[in-house]
């Protein structure tokens, strides 16, 4: 049976993550409060951030920057700013 969470990002009850994907207290907070759908949205933004800003995940400062962006996106409702990205226009 799927585990549901009250997703703070989507502001609705939705299927939760199957297991804790991120370490520590923040990982527990994500597991308890973020849905699979919201996590998938974050992963798309994360990939774009890493590529556009040429982040190196071996660099502590880059990992800290990415973690702060994740907190802002998932818990504070702030959109990720990606320079030069223009969303596709739907017809």
Curated annotation (Swiss-Prot):
Keywords: Iron. One of its GO terms (cellular component) is cytosol. GO terms for biological process: cellular response to oxidative stress. The keyword Metal-binding does not apply. Pfam families: Iron_traffic (PF04362). It comes from the Bacteria. Belongs to the Fe(2+)-trafficking protein family. Could be a mediator in iron transactions between iron acquisition and iron-requiring processes, such as synthesis and/or repair of Fe-S clusters in biosynthetic enzymes. This is Probable Fe(2+)-trafficking protein. It comes from Shewanella denitrificans (strain OS217 / ATCC BAA-1090 / DSM 15013). The lineage of its organism: Bacteria, Pseudomonadati, Pseudomonadota, Gammaproteobacteria, Alteromonadales.
């Amino acid at each position: 049976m799927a585990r549901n969470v009250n997703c703070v990002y989507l502001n609705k009850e939705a299927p939760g993550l199957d297991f804790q994907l991120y370490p520590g207290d923040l990982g527990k907070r994500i597991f308890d409060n973020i849905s699979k759908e919201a996590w998938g949205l974050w992963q798309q933004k994360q990939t774009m951030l890493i590529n556009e800003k040429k982040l190196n995940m071996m660099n502590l400062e880059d990992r800290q920057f990415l973690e702060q962006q994740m907190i802002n996106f998932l818990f504070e409702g702030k959109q990720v700013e990606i320079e030069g990205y223009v969303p596709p226009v739907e017809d």
